[in-house]
């Protein structure tokens, strides 16, 4: 059920912006994709956001267009706090060879740099470790334009990651417990490395060394200590899709819980 909600959410947001009906935008089964539907997000970011910005200077329907960085930021209307970071270039997804080029923009860090947009929707009360990035694989997404989900971490995921000692992950190593019943490999990355290089080459090296393909790789990034991040990769199969977005909570209940705790302390 959770995966079905994830697959539909982006399509519903697109339908709201394009004026299409939900039925028209709802994805086909992953093994029988509708090309027209799966290109909807690309058409929005290219035809409307980028070209519109070039002609009028306005970002709409995106929140931001950054031609220098080669990215756009798109508010997912169907979810209250989620944003999507998208390339302005045609990049289909995590499996696209363009992400392996040395000159490829640092999309993951650009997504992290946009975290303030999520926090601002929560009165700027969200600590950085509560913000979480996720990329779904080809068979667990509805759109064939790379989009990085920027949202809140789920409380369950947060509790597990609090127990992780980043110093133990200087090389790839599986987390000691599963996340949403899936095994994730983890690699610690400091802020300087995260900011200065694209991590997609490291991800592909790991995935291919394990005998798997990027088509089925699911990726997430968490901030687990000051200036320390954890790169997470789950390797699914054609028959078993793993969506890293499952580790997020677009309702941001973790922020509401924090706000409630602060209110209680204020009353004391």
Curated annotation (Swiss-Prot):
GO terms for biological process: CDP-diacylglycerol catabolic process; phospholipid biosynthetic process. Its main location: membrane. The chain crosses the membrane at residues 5-23. It is an enzyme of class 3 (hydrolase). Pathway: Phospholipid metabolism; CDP-diacylglycerol degradation; phosphatidate from CDP-diacylglycerol: step 1/1. GO terms for molecular function: CDP-diacylglycerol diphosphatase activity. It catalyses: a CDP-1,2-diacyl-sn-glycerol + H2O = a 1,2-diacyl-sn-glycero-3-phosphate + CMP + 2 H(+). One of its GO terms (cellular component) is plasma membrane. SUPFAM superfamilies: HIT-like. Belongs to the Cdh family. This is Probable CDP-diacylglycerol pyrophosphatase. It comes from Mycobacterium leprae (strain TN). The gene is cdh.
């Amino acid at each position: 059920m959770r995966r079905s909600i994830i697959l539909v959410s982006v399509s519903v947001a697109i339908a709201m912006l394009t004026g299409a009906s939900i039925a028209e935008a709802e994805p086909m089964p992953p093994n029988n994709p509708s090309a027209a539907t799966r290109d909807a997000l690309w058409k929005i970011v290219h035809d409307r956001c980028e070209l519109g910005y070039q002609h009028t200077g306005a970002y709409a329907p995106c929140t931001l267009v950054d031609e220098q960085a080669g990215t756009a930021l798109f508010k997912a209307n169907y979810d209250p706090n989620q944003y999507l970071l998208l390339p302005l270039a045609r990049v289909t997804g995590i499996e696209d060879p363009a992400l392996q080029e040395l000159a490829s923009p640092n999309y993951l860090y650009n997504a992290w740099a946009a975290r303030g947009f999520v926090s601002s929707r929560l009165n700027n009360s969200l600590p950085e470790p509560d913000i979480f990035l996720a990329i779904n694989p080809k068979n667990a997404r509805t759109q064939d334009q790379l989009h990085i989900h920027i949202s809140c971490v789920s409380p369950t995921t947060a509790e597990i990651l609090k127990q992780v000692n980043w110093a133990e992950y200087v090389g790839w190593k599986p987390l000691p417990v599963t996340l949403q019943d899936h095994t994730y490999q983890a690699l610690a990355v400091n802020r300087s490395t995260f900011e200065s290089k694209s991590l997609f080459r490291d991800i592909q090296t790991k995935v291919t060394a394990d005998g798997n393909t990027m088509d089925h790789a699911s990726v997430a990034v968490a901030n687990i200590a000051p200036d320390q991040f954890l790169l997470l990769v789950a390797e699914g199969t054609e028959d078993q899709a793993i969506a890293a977005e499952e580790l997020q909570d677009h309702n941001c209940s973790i922020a509401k819980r924090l706000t409630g705790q602060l209110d209680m302390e204020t009353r004391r």
